[in-house]
């Protein structure tokens, strides 16, 4: 068997890798050391605290990945709108660089409208 599972996670014993849900409260996430963080429904996060903890938790990794899956939501002051705004600037640079665009080859964005 390549993977094992239990009620807490899916894991690969040979490498010590695991996929498991973690708290949505940033105060309970200190000490993480992750390769990948997945945030579901980013628009529902009232602050950017969880996002910042995940960014910090990937700091020791050369090819870390953080991504969000979300619907738009309504909060134009939150982390979701901030990421959306950044994504649009990166996407604008893809085929037609302009002064309002950002070149960031480390950022992938896909927006369905």
Regions found by a protein language model. Give the residues of each.
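Substrate-engagement module of ASCE P-loop NTPases
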Residues: 55-66
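Non-catalytic nucleic-acid-binding interfaces of large nucleic-acid enzymes and RNP effectors
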Residues: 5-8
